[in-house]
Structures are given as C-alpha cells and as structure tokens.
Amino acid sequence: MSPERFAVKLRALRKRRKMTQATLAKKAGVSRAYLSRLEMGLHDPPLSRLRKLAKALRVAVAELLS
C-alpha cells in the first residue's frame, strides 16, 4: 500500500473512533508530529508501529492495510 493510501485509511479510522491525533498518538506510543506525517502520507511505518496503531484503534493490522 502506498503511503498516501495508508494516510487516508489511518485518518478515516481515527475519525471513526472520534479520536484526535494527540489521543491516538498517546495510545500508540508515538509523537503527534509523527502521526501527522503519517496522515499526510510522508512516512511508511514499520510493522512494529503498524501493530501499535492497530491496537490503539482496536482494529487488525490487515484492516489498516486494506
């Protein structure tokens, strides 16, 4: 999946959960700035971060990547 498509998916899942970037970042153990860059499609996160984001969003990693 391209970083741009991942960005759209991540933002949509975060908003569906009614979470701010700051809230999701804290739950996932990443900085808000890093999360912002992910949502802009500027980074391609490693699997370890995908797992943390998925857990914080209460979804499977596969859903983040679909």
Regions found by a protein language model. Name each.
Residues 1-5:
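A detector for short, charged/polar N-terminal pre-domain segments
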Residues 6-8, 32, 47-50:
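Short alpha-helical elements of helix-turn-helix
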Residues 8-27, 52:
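Short basic helix-loop element that most often maps to the first helix and adjoining turn
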Residues 10, 24-25, 35-38, 64:
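Conserved hydrophobic/aromatic packing and binding residues within compact polymer-binding modules
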Residues 12, 16, 44, 56-59:
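Conserved amphipathic alpha-helical interaction elements at protein-protein interfaces in regulatory
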Residues 40, 59, 66:
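Short, conserved catalytic or interaction motifs in soluble domains
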